Amino acid sequence: MTPISVILVTDNKLTRPKTMSTTREKLLRTTSRFVSTFGSFDIEEILSIRTPTCLYHQCCPSFNKNVVTNEETRANFPQFIATFKRFDFSIIEPDHTLVDEAARRVMIRAKASAESIVGAYENEYIFILKMTDDCRFIEEIYEFYDTIRLKDLQYRLEAKHISYGDAAPFKTRDTQL
């Protein structure tokens, strides 16, 4: 079994290796593209780094999330851009990014800072990205996030009588609770 390549920088005494493997560089480059497209408001750009069969696992049981396909992402996207005026997305503590070269996986901790039609929205995430063998595309995305913060946004939308509908990224209180 190939060991997982992990670089954790906890103080100034530890530094990155002077040379990174080509696989590691490719994985991190694709991860960087994922992060930069996340808040782009361009569905073609967002999907361009995914394989046609990419599966997006939203791993928050309290929202009854299932696996989302590219087609479902495309169908739900108009509701996303109607809800958010701005969506900034970035990696928290990049030095804590985990890279498993053999499995072609990268784990990042990220944050969103956004302006929605009902005010500010912030959240934190953990993403695990499974890449293709050539490391250029994402085959699977596993997303974990703070459900309390998302529920707060949901309740604020409902208070303004803004319906997201069943196909939206989350359901209204009437259909969820």
UniProtKB/Swiss-Prot annotation:
User: How does it associate, per the subunit comment?
Assistant: Homodimer.
Please state what is observed when this gene is inactivated.
Answer: Strongly decreases the production of austinol and dehydroaustinol.
Q: InterPro entries per the record?
A: Fungal_Meroterpenoid_Isomerase (IPR050977), NTF2-like_dom_sf (IPR032710)
Q: Which species is this UniProt entry from?
A: Emericella nidulans (strain FGSC A4 / ATCC 38163 / CBS 112.46 / NRRL 194 / M139)
This protein's pathway reads: Secondary metabolite biosynthesis; terpenoid biosynthesis
Q: State what protein this is by name.
A: Austinoid biosynthesis clusters protein F
The extra comment attached to this record reads:
In A.calidoustus, the austinoid gene cluster lies on a contiguous DNA region, while clusters from E.nidulans and P.brasilianum are split in their respective genomes. Genetic rearrangements provoked variability among the clusters and E.nidulans produces the least number of austionoid derivatives with the end products austinol and dehydroaustinol, while P.brasilianum can produce until acetoxydehydroaustin, and A.calidoustus produces the highest number of identified derivatives.
Instruction: Give a short account of what the protein does.
Output: Part of the gene cluster B that mediates the biosynthesis of austinol and dehydroaustinol, two fungal meroterpenoids. The first step of the pathway is the synthesis of 3,5-dimethylorsellinic acid by the polyketide synthase ausA. 3,5-dimethylorsellinic acid is then prenylated by the polyprenyl transferase ausN. Further epoxidation by the FAD-dependent monooxygenase ausM and cyclization by the probable terpene cyclase ausL lead to the formation of protoaustinoid A.
GO biological process terms held by the UniProt record: terpenoid biosynthetic process
Q: Which family does it belong to?
A: Belongs to the trt14 isomerase family.
Q: Which domain of life is it from?
A: Eukaryota
